[in-house]
Design a protein with these regions (language model features):
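A shared catalytic/ligand-binding motif for oxyanion handling
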Residues: 1-311
Length: 311
C-alpha cells in the first residue's frame, strides 16, 4: 500500500510537475492526491498523462484558486463516492489482494471563520461508511501548540474544535517520519512560522489492515508544503528492478565536453556491431553520455534526494 498527498501550490510551474513526476516514478503509489492544482480539467489531463496516471477524478480550480485531483493506478479499482472543492471520497479495492478500504483526500478551508464548515464536512463523511478509513490531506489546522513554531499563538478553541472533530469521527493521527512541520513561511524580519498542517488520520481498522505502513514528510523546494508519502518499509525491496530509462539532460548542453562525447560516440557506433547503423550510433551515444555524466556530475538524483532530506 502506498499513496502520495501534496499541496503543490499550483501545477503551472514545470519544476513542480517534475518534482511530482519524480516522486511518482520512485514510489509508484496506488493513489496520488493533489491539492491546489490551480488548473482546469483539460490542463489536468496533460498532467495525468505525464504522471502515467490516466484514471482519476479532477475537481477544477475556481479562478485559478484551489483545485483537487485524485489519480490512481490502472490496476486499482477506485469508486469515487462524493467530491467537492474540499474533499474527494472514494472506495479503494486493491487488485492483487482484493482488500477494500476507504480513502478521503481532504482540504480544510484556508479561512479561519469557515473552518467549522470543514469539520462538519469531516463528521458528515464519517457517517457514510464503516470501511477501514484513511483521511489524508492539508487540514489547514493544528491539533496542539506543539505543532507550531513562530508567528502568533493559535487560539486554543480553534485547535480544540479540530481535536473534537477528529475524536467524533473515531480517527487518530498516525504520526510521521521526517521533519516536524509540513508548512513554512517567512514573516519578513520576524523570522519563520512553521506548522504541521498536513497529516494522515486513520481508523483503528485501517491500522489493523496496514500495520506496517508509515507516513513520511518529504521536503519539496517548489512548494511551501511538504509532500506526504505513505508507504511500507519493505515497499522498495519488493519492487522489481527495471532497466533505467535513458534521459538526455538539458544541463549537459552547457558543458563544452558534451559535443565531443557525442561526436566520438557517433563515430564509434559506425564501426561496431551488425545492427541498424542509426541504432548502433544511438546506443553508443547513450552509453557514453551516461558514463560521462556519472564521472562529470555524479548521481544528480541522489544528490537532490539527500538535500531534500536535509531540508
Amino acid at each position: 500500500m502506498s499513496a502520495i498527498c501534496w499541496n503543490c501550490r499550483g501545477l503551472g510551474n514545470p519544476c513542480t510537475v517534475k518534482a511530482l513526476q519524480r516522486a511518482v516514478l520512485e514510489e509508484d503509489p496506488i493513489l496520488v492526491f493533489i491539492i491546489e492544482t490551480r488548473l482546469v480539467v483539460s490542463e489536468m489531463e496533460v498532467i495525468k498523462s505525464k504522471l502515467d496516471r490516466q484514471p482519476g477524478l479532477v475537481v477544477p480550480s475556481i479562478r485559478r484558486g484551489g483545485g483537487l485531483a485524485l489519480l490512481w493506478r490502472r490496476s486499482t479499482k477506485v469508486d469515487v463516492q462524493t467530491f467537492s472543492p474540499h474533499h474527494i471520497d472514494a472506495i479503494v479495492t486493491e487488485e492483487h489482494n482484493n482488500r477494500t478500504w476507504r480513502f478521503t483526500g481532504f482540504y480544510g478551508d484556508s479561512e479561519t471563520n469557515k473552518r467549522e464548515e470543514s469539520w462538519r464536512l469531516l463528521e458528515e463523511l464519517s457517517t457514510r461508511s464503516n470501511l477501514p478509513w484513511l483521511c489524508m490531506g492539508d487540514f489547514n489546522e493544528i491539533l496542539h501548540l506543539g505543532e507550531k513554531v513562530g508567528g502568533n499563538l493559535r487560539p486554543e478553541g480553534q485547535m480544540r474544535s479540530f481535536r473534537e472533530a477528529v475524536n467524533r469521527c473515531n480517527l487518530r493521527d498516525m504520526g510521521y517520519i521526517g521533519a516536524a512541520f509540513t508548512w513554512s513561511r517567512r514573516l519578513g524580519d520576524r523570522g519563520w512560522v512553521r506548522e504541521r498542517l498536513d497529516r494522515a488520520l486513520v481508523s483503528s481498522s485501517w491500522v489493523t489492515m496496514f500495520p506496517e505502513v508509515r507516513l513520511h514528510h518529504v521536503a519539496a523546494s517548489t512548494s511551501d508544503h511538504c509532500m506526504l508519502v505513505l508507504k511500507a518499509p519493505r515497499a522498495r525491496q519488493r519492487k522489481h528492478r527495471r532497466s533505467k530509462m535513458f534521459r538526455f539532460e538539458s544541463m549537459w548542453l552547457k558543458d563544452e565536453q558534451c559535443e565531443e562525447v557525442v561526436s566520438e560516440a557517433w563515430e564509434k557506433g559506425k564501426t561496431i556491431g551488425t545492427q541498424n547503423l542509426f541504432t548502433q550510433c544511438m546506443d553508443e551515444c547513450r552509453r557514453s553520455l551516461s558514463s560521462w555524466n556519472k564521472n562529470k556530475f555524479g548521481h544528480v538524483g541522489q544528490k537532490i534526494s539527500t538535500l531534500q532530506k536535509k531540508l
